[in-house]
Amino acid sequence: MAIQLSKGQRIDLTKTNPGLTKAVIGLGWDTNKYSGGHDFDLDASAFLVDAHDNCVNDLDFVFYNNLEHPSGGVIHTGDNRTGEGDGDDEQIIVDFSKIPAHIEKIGITVTIHDAEARSQNFGQVSNAFVRVVDEETQNELLRFDLGEDFSIETAVVVCELYRHGGEWKFNAIGSGFSGGLAALCRNYGLQV
């Protein structure tokens, strides 16, 4: 059975799961009834950052227009433009054995595409979650339900995977940002 985490909790991934080399980071959400006339398009992204919490270059930003990190260590499986259906709406596959040595952390985020133009925000999103699944066994290792703590935010840092003592750990963040994808890019040291 998967471990259920709360905001701010940290847990070991690779030490307590020997042999874990590839993990599927599954993200899901529902949108509340909304009469704004536009569909919601939520997008998952991964920011691979160094010890200074910055991406070294644009290729360290994996998202719908850059589906794979050059190392092959992080792969976005594609953009789900509707978020309809049960289960994961988008997935990011992390192969810990291929992550370059200078990468200390992987920030997993979700943004709302064209949020400002469509008058959309995370206050209109419910049942958001992230889960980590062992790709080989398909066992769900952990789950973090984000709750309903958002109002005007258009981007969320959902979680971080980070190195500590030669192992990979998971940090349940759940921190909202205004300013969408551009604000997140600036947060991780990218020019927009």
Curated annotation (Swiss-Prot):
Pfam families: TerD
Gene3D superfamilies according to UniProt: sav2460 like domains
Domain of life of the native organism: Bacteria
CDD domains recorded: TerD_like (cd06974)
InterPro entries: Stress/Tellurium_Resist (IPR051324), TerD (IPR003325)
PANTHER family linked: CAMP-BINDING PROTEIN 1-RELATED, TELLURIUM RESISTANCE PROTEIN TERD
Family stated for the protein in its record: Belongs to the CAPAB/TerDEXZ family.
Protein name according to UniProt: Uncharacterized protein YceE
Organism: Bacillus subtilis (strain 168)
